[in-house]
Amino acid sequence: MARIAGVNIPDNKHTVISLTYIYGVGRTTAQKICAATGVNPAAKIKDLTDEQIEQLRGEVAKVNTEGDLRREVNMKIKRLMDLGCYRGLRHRKGLPVRGQRTKTNARTRKGPRKPIRK
């Protein structure tokens, strides 16, 4: 298994699919990385040379991924909560943020049902 950006990349999958195992790299970004390095997107990771894997590592390093990206997302959410805006309040209360209904749905965000006290 190759290791790129601190993530074990599966050997037996195509390069584009394998790169999506990195947090912050989707299909489009993976295709751009392959195009920039000149690596065949349909080639499997185990068939790549060490030099090609190093090129992939270099390109992935340019993209904001893994811990840095997670930290950035958390900081943006924390900023909304500190501002006290509507989205921040919804985050703070653990409710849906993007306008979804909550009367009947939103169980994932609200958590399990609480029994009604009499």
From Swiss-Prot:
Per UniProt, which keywords does this protein have?
Ribonucleoprotein, Ribosomal protein, RNA-binding, rRNA-binding, tRNA-binding
Q: Where is this region: Disordered?
A: 93-118
Metal-binding among keywords: no
Question: Could you cite one Gene Ontology molecular function of this protein?
Answer: rRNA binding
The reply on keyword 4Fe-4S is no
Q: Which protein family is it in?
A: Belongs to the universal ribosomal protein uS13 family.
> What does the record note on quaternary structure?
Part of the 30S ribosomal subunit. Forms a loose heterodimer with protein S19. Forms two bridges to the 50S subunit in the 70S ribosome.
What's the protein called, per UniProt? Small ribosomal subunit protein uS13
Give the originating organism: Ectopseudomonas mendocina (strain ymp)
Name the gene that codes for it: rpsM
